[in-house]
Amino acid sequence: MADQHLHIVSFDVPSPPNYGGVIDVFYKVKALSELGVKVQLHCFQYGRPKAKELESLCVSVHYYPRHTGKHQLFNSLPYVVLSRRSEALVERLLQDEYPILFEGLHSCYYLGDHRLQGRLRLVRAHNVEHDYYTALAKAEGNAFRRTYFINEARKLQRFEPVLSEADHVLAISPKDEAYFSGHFRSVKHIPAFHACDKVEVPDGLSDFAFYHGALGVAENDQAALYLVRKVFKDLPVKLVIAGSFASGELKREIARAKNVELRENIGTEEIHRLVRQAQVNVLPTFQATGIKLKLLLCLYTGRHVVCNTPMVEGTGLAELCHVHDSPEAMRTSIISCIGKPANGQAIELRARVLEERFSNRRNAEAIVRLLR
């Protein structure tokens, strides 16, 4: 059988895989490579260096600078799309007839380009982007950034019909699949790719709860503040919060709390170690969009997971978590989990559900079938 080649256009450099979107891209590239797919990776670059590790997974890796001038905010196209354009990218794509996978609506500037007519084109939909940006606006305290998110949400909704140019739209969650199927043809649910091969939950007990996230993102800042102020206030359980770029407000709240510790700007390996060591991974969110990759990490490698409904909404994973929507119920659940090993039927169910639905290899094989 002839080699299967695939161009992947990524919105960012996907290594190191240390935040939601790039985790999906990195482990997708890895899984496809392990199946023998010859991946030609194209990355838009801003703030993240070139990554040597990608060269061992791909036959070629190309980098393109993002055009980040503020004057582009006044264009009718979304800033996140307009800033990811490069004639050098198109020229490389035109050198052969291989299929193209565009990662996210952000990278779809050339999806409808007449020069790519006739090519097999796929889009990985990481979110319903206008919903995601609307939720970011609601969580944002800074007036300028809130206005930016509102405008960007409107532009992304207007731009979204470009997905009709794709031969296949790969939705990341069942909820997103239902949305995109109402607007576009050939929509398929391909679950998120992630770092874990099998469910491995530590034995024994620990004595702390853990929350992690990119704290500079308003959604995560809001979740961390909720935990410190509402859930862990005067709770006889230690909470460790890890992430980068914590807000001044969050730092002040943590300084006042005797049972909360901040671990800032630590590496991915240390995050993974804390997920495994914690007795409870607490994962509130106020944004029910896509699927949170940190939820998968915690279910594969952590003990108990306590979260709220938006974290699991539309994912099919609610039965694997302790789901509570009030601070009081969350507090009670955390105290219950602190004294209880994570084992038995609950972990067997986790293994059955996750290894059936979130197998990187099986989901990569589903993508390969679409390329033929």
Q: What do these predicted regions represent?
A:
Residues 189-256, 261-276:
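Conserved catalytic-core segment of nucleotide-activated headgroup transferases in glycan assembly
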Residues 91-109, 120-122:
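Short N-terminal targeting/anchoring amphipathic segment
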Residues 100, 116-139:
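Active-site proximal beta-strand in glycosyltransferases
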Residues 1-60, 95:
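N-terminal subdomain of nucleotide-sugar transferases
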Residues 149-199:
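Donor nucleotide-sugar binding/catalytic pocket of nucleotide-sugar-dependent glycosyltransferases
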Residues 88-94, 129-132, 140-169:
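Membrane-proximal helix-turn-helix segments that form the acceptor-binding/catalytic region
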Residues 275-290, 301-303:
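Acidic donor-binding loop of glycosyltransferase active sites
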Residues 84, 341-372:
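A charged, aromatic-enriched C-terminal amphipathic alpha-helix characteristic of glycosyltransferases
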